């Protein structure tokens, strides 16, 4: 399914991404796995884990930014939408 495909995972530096990414890289052979996250520090930390894997790319962005999302989606075959706000009162307030 994901073999030789480009996958974008929104919220990829979160808890779901930490499980999904290594599993996908091991079980399938994606052409590219783009990790979209608004958290630069989490991307920096995660980039160290995948520094030797040219299939893994990082993209700073927010799913609420339409122009940034259009740019991130260019050439993507599949989107795994895992972006979320975990703190319910914050999500309800905003």
Q: What are the residue ranges of the model-derived segments?
A:
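Catalytic, metal-anchored helix/loop core of enzyme active sites in primary metabolism
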Residues: 1-4, 15, 55, 64
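Phosphate-coordination loops involved in phosphoryl transfer and adenosine-cofactor binding
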Residues: 3-6, 30, 76
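N-terminal Rossmann NAD(P)H-binding glycine-rich loop of SDR-like oxidoreductase domains
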Residues: 5-27
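Conserved Rossmann-like nucleotide-binding pocket used by diverse enzymes
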Residues: 8, 34, 59
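Glycine/Thr-rich phosphate-binding loops of Rossmann-like dinucleotide-binding domains
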Residues: 17, 43, 88-89
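Conserved glycine-rich Rossmann-like NAD(P)H-binding loop of the short-chain dehydrogenase/reductase
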Residues: 28-42
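Short alpha-helix adjacent to the SAM-binding motif of class I
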Residues: 42-49
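NAD(P)H-binding glycine-rich loop region in Rossmannoid oxidoreductase-like domains
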Residues: 50-94
